[in-house]
């Protein structure tokens, strides 16, 4: 004797949240499955660019100094106004934020200066 889908749906519809939770656990044990949500890959670069454009504040992060460390230190000094020692410590401690809470234009400008000096930079 088979039970119709409508009968099952009607039974589930009348259950409380606690009863539904117990039902899900019983399904997991009986069939060896998990009710955890599956992570779905989002759109590639287009989606990330759209999300970045919606942000109003950015953090410029120095990911890696690269091979021309002196030029990167000079760029950090120019962007932040730090002294030589502070700029060198920041570059040596990469990955570190260079500027925080800046608008898109300032973040892009700082990123360009650092990349032109040979650094790897991320905007967050």
Curated annotation (Swiss-Prot):
Keywords, ordered alphabetically: Ribonucleoprotein, Ribosomal protein
Domain of life: Bacteria
GO BP of this protein: translation
Annotated S-S bridges: none
GO MF annotations in UniProt: mRNA binding; structural constituent of ribosome
CDD domains registered for this protein in UniProt: Ribosomal_L7_L12 (cd00387)
InterPro entries: Ribosomal_bL12, Ribosomal_bL12_C, Ribosomal_bL12_C/ClpS-like, Ribosomal_bL12_oligo, Ribosomal_bL12_oligo_N_sf
Summary of subunit composition and partner proteins: Homodimer. Part of the ribosomal stalk of the 50S ribosomal subunit. Forms a multimeric L10(L12)X complex, where L10 forms an elongated spine to which 2 to 4 L12 dimers bind in a sequential fashion. Binds GTP-bound translation factors.
Protein name: Large ribosomal subunit protein bL12
Origin species: Burkholderia mallei (strain ATCC 23344)
Gene of this entry: rplL
